[in-house]
Each structure stands twice: as structure tokens, then as C-alpha cells.
Amino acid sequence: MSFDVLTINPGSTSTKLAVYQGDKVLFEETVRHTMQELADFNNVQEQFDFRWQVLRRVMDAHGYDVKNLQAVVGRGGLLRPVAGGTYMVTEKMIDDLKENKYGEHASNLGAMLAKKLADELTIPSFIVDPVVVDEMQEIARISGNAFVARKSIFHALNHKAAGRKIAKELGNDYEKMNFVIAHLGGGISVAAHRQGRVVDVNNALDGDGPFSPERSGSLPMNDFLEACFSGKWTKRELHELIVGRGGMISYLGTNSMLEVEAKVQAGDVKAMEAFDAMAYQVSKEIGACSVVLQGKIDAIILTGGLARSELFTSKIIEQTNWITSVIIEPGEDELEALNSGVQRVLAGLEKEKEY
């Protein structure tokens, strides 16, 4: 049996919407938001009414009767750490998101928009595999200093979706397989998936693991500490050095990997060094996750937008295919992943979880 499900993915400069009937897309639309449109809002929460109007306009434009919906799902935002799965949107979840209790991000609006429409229609609302999915084994939380623990913040939705898809293609269940999965995008996260659980992963948001097009990844601690007390930067500026203006931006002045790759192919030495270093760091992280799984790995999976780059993935494959086979699952279809999670619950194949 198939179900009509509306999927909502609010990003920092866009709102992506789609209605599915089972695994069939009835319609999909991405609405881009200009800096001018967003300039009047002081924070993400103030954008709620604006995004709500966008949602209603899109539904009306496609002539879809929302009364046909059987569920609404939003992208999960910054919440307390939870295990992977599909979660009912509750008042407690909404309260935490409204207060930005665990951080502020456009994805916080996903559950809020989903619940508003679902409540009007008296149907359930969900989120699926939010970025705060935390299934790390306890030994992986130990950082090296007792005052701070390692955190699990990564591209959980795409990691889990890629794992499920490849497991199915290999004729098995995600929950019965071991993968090392690398999400390659604006941020990069590399995780050890052991029988359906992400037992170790770099914190792709807060400065851990490989550098990416716009994030610094792990930095030499003492040098960064010196920068913190140099008086040259504010706390906000230092944070931007880690997330937003780190990685390729700091080396080459751009976060566009298309531009970087063009420079590499034109023989730009500086671009080649940075490009090779990023592939090297991703490969090294894959190797580390292979140790976490004690070498018992069914496949290495490369996913995310950068997995479309044959040049970039070839450099990773050269350095890691001695471990096991490397499978490329390019792109990230977050709307499809959100829908799949809800379809499984509505069909009774999986039980929803409560926040």
C-alpha cells in the first residue's frame, strides 16, 4: 500500500517541497530565497510565517488537495542527541526547536512547518534521521580531555539513506551490514556503520575530521589557541574560520569545487595541492573508520554532491580500494529519504519513535 506524504526541507537559502505517493513523486519544487528576502529576519524563527506562505503557495500552484495527505514530514533540526529512525513530532520537540535549545539552523523549521499543516489536517507529522543522530559507541566519545566529549553531528539522513539503498542493491538489509560511508559536500562526514548503527563519526560541523569546501576540519590545537588570544579576531570570526570560511575557501578563495577542479585541470599548483590534500584527509578518515570496524567491511560508500566528481572520487578510490570495494552513490536526495522513512512507518515495516 502506498501513502501520500508531503516532504519539507528548509535550507538556509531555499525551501524544498515534494509530494510522494509511495515512492512515486507527484511533484517536487525548490523555492530559492534571495538575501534581500531574508534580510528583514533577525533569526531563523522569524522566518516561520514566510516559509509557511511559501509552502501554501507551492501546494496551491500544483493544484494538490492537501486533504489527500496521510502524513507530513520535515527535515530534522538541531535537537538533543537521538538514535536513528523516524520520529513523531511532539510539543516537546517543537519547544526545543523554537527555543533553539541545541542550536539555530534553518532545518529547525522543518518539524514546525510539518506539525502546523498536519495538525490542521489531523494527520501525523514526522522527522527522519536528524543531524543529531547519536549511536556512537562509548569509547568513541572519549576526546582526550575529561572536560569535553566527542559529539555526533553529521549528515545522518543521507548516510542512512545511502546505506539502505546500497544494502538493498547488494541483496541484504542495512541492519545486517558493515559500511564506511563518506558524505562529500559543503561539509564532509565519514562514519563507521556497524549493522545499522553509526558507531563512530567525525563531527562535520564543529571542526573535526577532514577539511571540506568551506569547513576547516581538525586543526593544530595550539596554533588555533594562539589565534584565539591574539586579539585579531572576534569569537564569531574565529567560528567562521572553522565553519563557513575554512577549507577550500581559506586556500583558494572559493567553495565551488567546480572552480577548484577547473584550476586543477589547468595545472594550478596551489589548487592541485589543496585538492589532493582534501582527498588525502578523506581517505585517511576512511582508514580510521575501517579500524573501528576491525576490517570487517562490506563496502566503502562515497555519497553527497562531490561524489559526482570523477576526479575527486578517483583519488579517494586509489588510496582506499585495498581495504574493500568502493561504491559511488552520488548526490543526496533528502526529500526521498524523508519520504522513505515515513512510508516504512505507515506501512508497518518500522515503528515510529518518540522524542
Curated annotation (Swiss-Prot):
Q: Does the keyword Aminoacyl-tRNA synthetase apply?
A: no
Q: What Gene3D superfamilies does this protein map onto?
A: 3.30.420.40
* Protein localization: Cytoplasm
User: What domain of life does the UniProt record list for this protein's source?
Assistant: Bacteria
Where is the major localization of this protein? cytoplasm
Question: Which CDD domains has this protein been placed in?
Answer: ASKHA_NBD_BK (cd24011)
Which InterPro entries does UniProt cross-reference here?
Aliphatic_acid_kin_short-chain (IPR000890), Aliphatic_acid_kinase_CS (IPR023865), ATPase_NBD (IPR043129), Butyrate_kin (IPR011245)
Q: Which family does it belong to?
A: Belongs to the acetokinase family.
Protein name (database record): Probable butyrate kinase
Annotated source species? Listeria monocytogenes serotype 4a (strain HCC23)
Gene it is expressed from: buk
